Swiss-Prot record:
A translational regulator that binds mRNA to regulate translation initiation and/or mRNA stability. Usually binds in the 5'-UTR at or near the Shine-Dalgarno sequence preventing ribosome-binding, thus repressing translation. Its main target seems to be the major flagellin gene, while its function is anatagonized by FliW. One of its GO terms (cellular component) is cytosol. It comes from the Bacteria. Homodimer; the beta-strands of each monomer intercalate to form a hydrophobic core, while the alpha-helices form wings that extend away from the core. This is Translational regulator CsrA. The lineage of its organism: Bacteria, Bacillati, Bacillota, Bacilli, Bacillales. The gene is csrA.
């Protein structure tokens, strides 16, 4: 893991397309501004993990539905 120190108003560049700017530091919270192309999804980590869990559940449900439909058409 790369660890960098930045002050309010300073930025970090990731590749050619993503810029993170420190907007404010308030106690133990850091407010970030993110400039990135629209096609790049940006989520808080807990939201990203919840989306991954829901996608995994949905794909399992789709597999089950396919099996049920196959059983019905085979009968």
């Amino acid at each position: 893991m790369l660890v960098l120190k930045r002050k309010t108003g300073e930025a970090i560049q990731i590749g050619d397309d993503i810029e993170l700017t420190i907007l404010a530091i308030e106690g133990d919270q850091v407010k970030l501004g993110i400039h990135a192309p629209r096609q790049i999804d940006i989520h808080r980590k807990e939201i990203y993990l919840a989306i991954q869990d829901e996608n995994a559940e949905a794909s399992q449900s789709t597999g089950l539905m396919s099996q049920l439909l196959k059983q019905r058409t085979d009968s």
